[in-house]
Amino acid sequence: MASLDVLIVGLGSTHGLRAAEDELAGSLLRAGADAMLVRAERPREVRTLALTDLMWARAARRAAVESLAEAAPRAVVYSTTTAALLWPQPGAVRFDAPAAGNRPGRHGVWQRPVERRRLREAPLLVPQDAGALVEAGSPTTESVIVPIPVEPSDGGAGGVRDIAALTYATNPYKKGLDRVLAAWEAVRREDEELVVAGLRGPDRPGVRYAGTLDHDDYRALLRRARVYVTAPRREDYGIAQLEALADGTRVVTTPAPGPYAALPLLAGVGAEDGAPVGWVADPSPAALGAAVRAALDDATDDAVYADRALAAIAPFRRAAVDRTVAEELLPRLLRP
């Protein structure tokens, strides 16, 4: 049986999750670990969230069992609490948000109690943000916070900003597209256009739907946008907001429940100069619209803003995350 330092059992159910799993595996490899990432096979689609999670948990268990039969890892990391629900053996749990927060009522009827047990039994928790621990009930299990790394995209900031505003709305209700559209209608000027990525819809004056995009094409749009605006009803991390900052795009957002890792940074909480790099407003059309207008009319030079934004996201850059993985996470994973 082959030896292995770390086995990561991932779901890979979304692009964002696959990217986060790849980043964790890459950080472990750069830290000198012999790490392997395996993913669950996508199950057939079912109608309810509770059954969907069961199908994914069973698929993750199968992937773990098959890999454990071939290798003897010193540590196992389950990527998401769903992957850990039916684990064949205990391991560290990597998660952005617990079912306690994003599976209310009947949607999490079986997941929440099993999740609480797994978070108690795990040797280590690896949340992406401290807010995820709070939402999980502040379990006493040892934890290491490891953010998702964010870097400027190829091309970076500095190009032509010929799109006034961009929003991402693959889940329009959760992302608050209705709020964004109402605010946009209240403040847009005749020559300004909002591009809606991740969704198809009827174009109208001032609003254009870009549909589903691959990630490189989306980041290319982001580099062209002056403002990224979002009004989420719940936010489990805020990776799109961090990517916007990485590409020098001004960010407008509303507060939202959930472990919204990007929100304190956007609001200037903890900043040395106390200055926010984003515009945070209530979701009413008047308040959100005023924030969008202020961001669009911001007189700060684009290059100066891009430098400030990059400095603000320093804790989320790959080099910082690699240090955390090498100095804090890996020693705890491999501790006898």
Predicted regions and their residues:
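A charged, aromatic-enriched C-terminal amphipathic alpha-helix characteristic of glycosyltransferases
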Residues: 54, 58, 283, 287, ...
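Aromatic "clamp/platform" in nucleotide-sugar-dependent glycosyltransferases that forms part
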Residues: 233
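Membrane-proximal helix-turn-helix segments that form the acceptor-binding/catalytic region
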Residues: 106-128
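Carbohydrate-associated surface elements
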Residues: 131, 149
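Active-site proximal beta-strand in glycosyltransferases
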Residues: 77, 82, 86-106
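Conserved donor-binding/catalytic core segment of Leloir-type glycosyltransferases
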Residues: 150, 156-175, 181-186, 194-195
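Short hydrophobic beta-strand element within catalytic cores of glycosyltransferases
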Residues: 250-254, 260
